[in-house]
Amino acid sequence: MSQTPPSFIRLLNNTSLVSQILIGMIVGILLATLIPSAAQSAGLLGTLFVGALKAVAPVLVLLLVTDSIAGHKQGQKTSIRPLLILYLFGTFCAAVVAVVASFAFPSVLHLSAQNADIVPPGGIAEVLNTLLFNVVANPVKALLEGNYIGILAWAIALGLSLRKASDTTKAVIHDLSHAVSGIVKGVIRCAPLGIMGLVASTFAETGFSALLSYAQLLIVLIGCMLFVAFVVNPLIVFWKIKRNPYPLVLMCLKESGVTAFFTRSSAANIPVNMALCEKLRLPEETYAVSIPLGATINMAGAAITITVLSMAAVNTLGISVDLATAVLLSVVATISACGASGVAGGSLLLIPLACSLFGISNDVAMQVVAVGFIIGVLQDSAETALNSSTDVLFTAAACMAEDGSLSEGNLQEDADIV
């Protein structure tokens, strides 16, 4: 005779994960407001949650990609090529939006003589050089450091080598990938507690006092990201699937964007994105490659950050910018953004690269980077949410356009599950 689960467990099972996350956010804000000391302690939950996601993500990517490629049947269609085009085109469009917004609403920074103890890359060649060396990194080191370019390269090579392996070997790899996926689902169920801890500690430590002096800059930054998320990306998706894109857009923002906003890590959000792709019934051989690849090169948010902060520095110094230079800035921001995941400090440390186009010295550029760190509480969160949710969005759009693998009926059914 089966026992009835306790009422609290039933309530948890009947409440969607997104609703639980929203409750966790509210509890975190209240805790930071009423008991700041306890809120800082609660930050441990957030650190553990992000750490667990970062720990499991490299293994998940390695096994899923290896399994997908090893089990790939001759003639089976994938959507990787059109996805690469979508990723690059979407990032370039985001950079163009940021340039236009910077001309329309010029921001001015209050630069000081402070120097940051960090070293930015010397140029685009150095960024590309880092990416190429990431491809041939030691596989164990790549797993330990979360180098997803290296993990992808080794997983693809291993998968291709195992195509001629016995069915038993392929079955073992398949079972391992599903076992790790099960672990990921368990970690994701802890998201409400983790996000509560992240929100509580962030509010308790920083609040919003440091952000008020850069209100206009933040409005331009966040405004560009919202415009890309709700206007540009839907237009791109509509161009691909020829139907209303907003049910898919809103689902990706709700399930992927919300989690990414608080974890502030595209790598940590890879398991969340893969779980959403599975829920949307996308072909595993496509999303197992496209999601970790997107976490590395699909950087619309990073392109916006690089462009807006660079243009703010230009406006502050009174440098005039013509149309040709603005277009060149968009191209440089796109290429730089694709390498953001390969640079410690991400998009902010690529700002000196863009500033060098205008002859801005490294000392001044690093002051702009310092401003970026000050507003990073919101900037980095919004950037990651846009980057990560777009990975799923473009993956789903490419699959719908190529295979019709995601129908409106399936989308609505999955939306009801959330």
Curated annotation (Swiss-Prot):
What do the Gene Ontology cellular component annotations say? plasma membrane
Catalytic function, reaction form: L-serine(in) + Na(+)(in) = L-serine(out) + Na(+)(out); L-threonine(in) + Na(+)(in) = L-threonine(out) + Na(+)(out)
What GO biological process, any one, is recorded here? threonine transport
Q: SUPFAM superfamilies in the record, alphabetically?
A: Proton glutamate symport protein (SSF118215)
Annotated compartments: Cell inner membrane
Transmembrane ranges? Answer: 16-36, 45-65, 83-103, 142-162, 192-212, 218-238, 289-309, 317-337, 364-384
Recall the GO molecular function terms of this protein's record: neutral L-amino acid:sodium symporter activity
Q: Name one Pfam family in it.
A: SDF
* Membrane-topology descriptor: Multi-pass membrane protein
Give the record's keywords alphabetically: Amino-acid transport, Cell inner membrane, Cell membrane, Membrane, Symport, Transmembrane, Transmembrane helix, Transport
Name the HAMAP family for this protein.
Ser_Thr_transp_SstT
Described by its record, this protein's role is as follows: Involved in the import of serine and threonine into the cell, with the concomitant import of sodium (symport system).
Which family is annotated?
Answer: Belongs to the dicarboxylate/amino acid:cation symporter (DAACS) (TC 2.A.23) family.
Q: What is this protein called?
A: Serine/threonine transporter SstT
Source species of the chain: Tolumonas auensis (strain DSM 9187 / NBRC 110442 / TA 4)
